[in-house]
Amino acid sequence: EAAGLLPFPRL
């Protein structure tokens, strides 16, 4: 997913 765009990693 867009992990780099979020302020936290979606697990």
Curated annotation (Swiss-Prot):
Q: Where in the cell is it found?
A: Secreted
The alphabetized list of GO BP terms reads: neuropeptide signaling pathway
Gene Ontology annotations for the cellular component aspect, listed alphabetically: extracellular region
Keyword list, A-Z: Amidation, Neuropeptide, Secreted
Primary location recorded for the protein, binned into one broad class: secreted
Which residues are reported to carry the modification Leucine amide?
A: L11
Main function:
Mediates visceral muscle contractile activity (myotropic activity).
Name the family: Belongs to the periviscerokinin family.
Under which name does UniProt file this protein? Answer: CAPA-Periviscerokinin-1
